[in-house]
Amino acid sequence: EIALNLAAKDVRIQAPIPGKSTIGIELPNKVNSAVSFREILSKLPAPSDKTILAVGLGKDIMGTVKWAEINATPHLLIAGATGSGKSVCINCVIASILMRARPDEVKLVMVDPKKVELSMYNGVPHLLTPVVTDPKKASIALKNIVVEMERRYQVFEDTKCKNITAYNKMCETNTDYVKMPYIVFIIDELADLMLVAAKDVEDSIMRITQTARAAGIHLIVATQRPSTDVITGVVKANIPSRISFAVSSSIDSRTILDQTGAEKLLGKGDMLFKPMGENVPIRIQGAFVSDEELQKIVDYTISQQKANYDHSLTEDKSGSENGDNTKYDDGYESKEEYDDPLYNDIVDFAMEFGKISASLIQRKYRIGYNRAARIVDLLEERGIIGPQNGSKPREVLIKKEASNDSDE
């Protein structure tokens, strides 16, 4: 009756308004006011250790700028029907990170099964690997991120650090270790991944969302099919922070937010944001960023630094059928056959420095951890360095002349 008497498109009632003894009745304006991404970006807090992953969302009904801190979220589920503003929201999140964080501070992994939504970001130095468009490779990338998470926790245990913040602070005074970047893993369409390898994807998402927060790894999952076969109980239970755009039914709204309301949204960026720990979602008009603005951001970011990809992230490291050998880069089947263009330079560096570690190689040659670790394995296999001794760098066992003889 309220909608009828006011000739409104739709009415959303909030009873009661949190913190007040009143009931809220939300009426949509006849003409939507655009929310500029540039304005939202200018109102975000200055980048720091705590706010490096603050991303702009939009404005609430009072005109207050709203953002989300991904490292506090710590994972995010985004859902909504086609054309509701989901893709624009993802672009705002990515653009916020590109404009506020250096590539050595935050790394991105993007999965885009549709091949057109995120492909424009190829070449950005923040990318850990080129935008993944193959659902099978995306499933492998998720598994390898779990491996990276476990590696980080092993380093934290060796260095007696509780989380990535404490570890990076320790690296400022201990030059034997290199700082770790945050990793934000963005999946643009979860449904396509669930069709290919539902069990593997669900298991990896569960592992990451349950334990990866302290390791600085965060997951952003988006889907336009908010059904229970895509947003399963496991996914929902481990991703408490959610954003819902306009959906077609109250059932879909309950699937995303555990309550109705999203079916009454207007579309075009109108969203309900339910952060972790909050029972009542916040209604936000999402910021709009055009394709031209995004292209300018991408071009500017690429002009600052070239991308340095780690292609091993999308390689299956489970090994061959007998489980003895691992497939290395360039098609080699074992450490004995594998070689690296930087191998001789790294040997010379080790001779001069007297010790070596994967972290030192990372910092010196600006390569990924997996590649650095394989080179360390190769050096040990050839008797150039000693075995691992806890978290300390490895000792160099032979002199430069001996190394040259062995290479010959």
Task: State each model region's role.
Residues 23-27, 297, 394-396:
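Generic detector of short, aliphatic-rich beta-strand segments that form the cores of beta-sheets
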Residues 3-5, 15-26, 34, 39-162, ...:
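P-loop NTPase catalytic phosphate-binding loop
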